[in-house]
Structure formats: C-alpha cells, structure tokens
C-alpha cells in the first residue's frame, strides 16, 4: 500500500486540473463558491459513508474511522458541524450525492474515471490495489482464467470497470455477478462464510477484514495501486474542491495526515493466519472470564486494548512464566510487582490491576508534547524495553531530523537501538528495539481483531433481534 510520497504528485495534478477547469468553464463571479457557501450558510457539512473498517465504525458508542476522522476535521476547518449518513452500498452513496442529500462521499472510494462525467474528486489520501479474494482451503486461482465458481462485485464499483477491460483484452470467457444491495465488505464476508467463491476488493479493506475473518485469502492483484479519494458533485463543487485541496495540503504539511495513516493503516500488513485464528479462538474460549477484569482496571485506555496487551504478554494464561522470571497475565517482574503493591503475580486480578497501573504511570511520565492519542504507543514501547531506551529512541529520532513526538517517526528508530552504529550514540546503549517494535505492532493487530470481532457479534445479535 503506497503512502503520501506518491500522493503529493496526485494532489498537485488535481490542483492543476481544478485550476484549469475554473478558468475555462466558470465565469469569475461569486457563484463559484457554490456548495461551499451553502454548507457555511447551513452550518453543516453532510457526508455519506459506509459501515466499513476504514470509513466509519463505532467504538464504545463513539464514531471512528479514517474517513470519519478526516471529515470531522474538515468540518472543524470550515467552522460547521458534521452530519453523517451511513449507507450499506455504493448505489445508495451516489444517490445521496446526486439527490443533494450529501455534500461529500467520504467512504475510501477508489478513483473511477467513468464517474467523472457526473462527479468530481478530492485529493487522494492513500492508494490501494484491487485483489481477487477467495476462501482459504479452496484451490487458489493463478489468474482470472482459472476461476471455477461465482465471482461477484458491488454495483457501481471501480472493479467492474477493471473486469470489463480484462474481459475485452485477455479473458473473453470471464463472467461475474453484480450485487446492487451488498457492499464490498458484505461480499467479502460471504466469501469468508463459504457462500460466494470469489470477489474483488481493495488491499487495505482485505488486510483489515482478515483480522476478523482469517479464512479470507488473496489470490493475486488485478491492478496496480490506485488512489483513494472522496467524491463531490461536479455541477457545484468548485469552491468546495478548492477548500478540500487547501485542507488536505495543511494536513500533509503539519504531519496530521501521516499520524492518521499510521493510526488506521499502520498495522494492516503482517497478517499471520495461524496467529490470528488462535487469537480469535481465545476470544471465544478464554476472554469471557477475564473481560470483567480488563473493564474494571482499564481506566484511561480502552479495555480491549488492555486485553490485547495481556494476550501479547501471556496469551491470557494467569500462570505464564518466562525464562527471565516475569509472570502472570501481564508478565510483571518481581521488582515491578513490589513497586505496585502486587503480592501474587499469578493472581489474575492482581496482575491486571498491576499491569494497568504500571502502564498508566508510564503514560504520565511522557512529555505533554506527544499527542494524547499516540502516548499509548510510546508507553507500550517503554513497557516492553524500558522507559530509558524509549527516551533514546526519541533522541535518535530528533538527531536524524525526525519528529520525536510522532510515533510514525519514532517507531522506525526502535530497531536501530540494537545496531552498534546507532546505540553507541545513545545514552543508555543497546536495547532490543526490534522486539519492542514487534510488540507494539502485534498489540495493535490484536486490538483490531478484538474490536472487529465484537462489532460483528453485536451486528449478528441485532439481526437476530429483528
């Protein structure tokens, strides 16, 4: 998955095209403020989005998601409130835009040239490839000519354009179904459940959904990476497009976009089927007995994150013991346990209480210059390799002209702490930095799996209730 090095070019290109369209098609008068003026007069930015891992979802009854986060920041930038409409498929999304029920479609949509006769696009904020997905355990096709079963894609998706081109150029026998009522995510879930043989989906969505449905497997990419963008109405969007360009440029310049990418996309890679499947099994078998403890002692962090930390430490085994003598659900050392007033490290409640308290203290020691939503990652690195070595990583980051308050920058320096050419420059010397890096990344993946698992469980319960 490509990040913003490529997308600066895309943003610049869009800016040039937008400027040209303004000069050639719009008389210079106040009318070009169009939809932007209406949004400000209304005091409300209306977006339509999808219930999907990257776009919009709820955590502890609070909305989240890459697109939601960007949209909320854009609404703040405009000085208006944000109104979100969650849709279930692409047809509903574009109907909202065409019927003036939405100002922007913020749903991690892939750039599709076929839609540009009626809609326009905002800047790209990441890029993805299109992948053929099948269920693990079934024969893996080597190309589109190997398909033996039903292939379905969502109506209105960019995948249809690609399939038409491939059918014309290379695979004349290629056939597929178009679903008008199911989203790409729903089709992926049907593949995972064995109710559909194949579908096409973007690489980011597949990577995230594999955390909940590890039986999803990628056969191959059918496209190069393509930009992901927002859609606007073409007829009245010049002022809004210009505002979006300025807003996205600011996010790139001040580092916020890089932080958001790290938050929502930084843990997508590194999928391990066996590890993910084992974790999901443990959620069913072991977590219910421990969940009340994680909820009780989580305090300043989400209990699901505390549970993920504990799983990384001990695989939720209260009697776990390492070769170095750390023990319990949170794998506390004897000196650390003593400092926290923990008498029995193998007592589940004492261990969770002690681990949560130790992590809280670690977060409190961190400088206020670190963004609040990133402190947890610094604290976890310190929890694993020691606070002093985390300070070394920050100092090394600053020395290399990086941002010592940005987890995106600091995490890249963690592996350097085990390399002589770098740790000789530090105050506290050698550290197992790669281990700390892997530690934090694993926890983030476990948290994503747990959040997704619980969301699906809630959805299924709601469907049964209906």
Swiss-Prot record:
The ranges of region (Non-LT domain) come to 25-268
Subcellular localization is given as: Cell outer membrane
Give the annotated active site.
313
**Which GO terms label this protein's molecular function in UniProt?**
peptidoglycan lytic transglycosylase activity
Q: Where is this region: LT domain?
A: 269-466
Alphabetized, the UniProt keywords read: Cell outer membrane, Cell wall biogenesis/degradation, Lyase, Membrane, Repeat, Signal
Q: Name any GO cellular component annotation.
A: cell outer membrane
Q: Which GO terms describe its biological process?
A: cell wall macromolecule catabolic process; cell wall organization; peptidoglycan catabolic process
Q: Which Pfam families match?
A: SBP_bac_3 (PF00497), SLT (PF01464)
Q: What InterPro entries does the entry give?
A: Lysozyme-like_dom_sf, MltF, Solute-binding_3/MltF_N, Transglyc_AS, Transglycosylase_SLT_dom_1
Its protein name is Membrane-bound lytic murein transglycosylase F
Q: Which organism is it from?
A: Sodalis glossinidius (strain morsitans)
């Amino acid at each position: 998955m490509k990040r913003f090095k490529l997308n600066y070019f895309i943003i610049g290109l869009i800016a040039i095209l937008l400027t040209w369209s303004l000069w050639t098609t719009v008389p210079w008068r106040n009318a070009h403020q169009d939809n932007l003026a209406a949004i400000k007069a209304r005091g409300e930015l209306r977006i339509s989005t999808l219930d999907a891992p990257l776009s919009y979802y709820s955590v502890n009854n609070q909305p989240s998601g890459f697109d939601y986060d960007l949209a909320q920041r854009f609404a703040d930038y405009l000085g208006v409130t944000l109104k979100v409409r969650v849709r279930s498929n692409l047809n509903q999304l574009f109907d909202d835009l065409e019927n003036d029920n939405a100002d922007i479609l913020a749903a991690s949509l892939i750039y599709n040239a076929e839609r540009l006769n009626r809609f326009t696009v905002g800047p790209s904020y990441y890029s993805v490839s299109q992948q053929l997905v099948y269920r693990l355990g079934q024969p893996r096709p080597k190309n589109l000519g190997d398909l033996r079963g039903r292939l379905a894609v969502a109506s209105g998706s960019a995948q249809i354009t690609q399939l038409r081109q491939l059918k014309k150029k290379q695979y004349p026998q290629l056939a597929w179904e178009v679903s008008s009522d199911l989203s790409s995510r729903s089709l992926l879930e049907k593949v995972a459940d064995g109710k559909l043989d194949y579908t096409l989906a973007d690489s980011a969505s597949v990577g995230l959904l594999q955390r909940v449905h590890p039986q999803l497997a990628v056969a191959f990419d059918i496209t190069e990476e393509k930009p992901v963008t927002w859609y606007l109405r073409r007829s009245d969007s010049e002022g809004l497009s210009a505002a979006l360009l300025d807003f996205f440029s600011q996010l790139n310049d001040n580092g916020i976009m890089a932080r958001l990418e790290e938050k929502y996309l930084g843990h997508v890679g590194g999928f391990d089927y066996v590890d993910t499947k084992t974790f999901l099994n443990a959620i069913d078998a072991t977590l219910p007995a421990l969940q009340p403890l994680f909820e009780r002692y989580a305090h300043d962090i989400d209990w699901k994150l505390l549970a993920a930390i504990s799983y990384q430490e001990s695989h939720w085994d209260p009697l776990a013991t390492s070769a170095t003598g750390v023990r319990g659900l949170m794998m506390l050392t004897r000196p650390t346990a003593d400092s926290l007033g923990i008498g029995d490290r193998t007592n589940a409640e004492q261990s969770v209480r002690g681990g949560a308290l130790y992590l809280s203290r670690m977060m409190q020691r961190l400088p206020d210059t670190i963004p609040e939503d990133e402190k947890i990652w610094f604290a976890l690195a310190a929890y694993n390799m020691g606070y002093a070595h985390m300070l070394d990583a920050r100092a090394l980051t600053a020395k290399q002209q990086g941002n010592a308050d940005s987890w995106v920058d600091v995490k890249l320096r963690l592996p350097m702490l085990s390399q002589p050419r770098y740790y000789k420059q530090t105050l506290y010397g050698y550290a197992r930095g790669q281990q700390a890096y892997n530690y934090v990344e694993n926890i983030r993946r476990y948290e994503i799996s747990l959040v997704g698992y619980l969301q699906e469980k809630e959805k299924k319960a709601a469907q049964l209730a209906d």
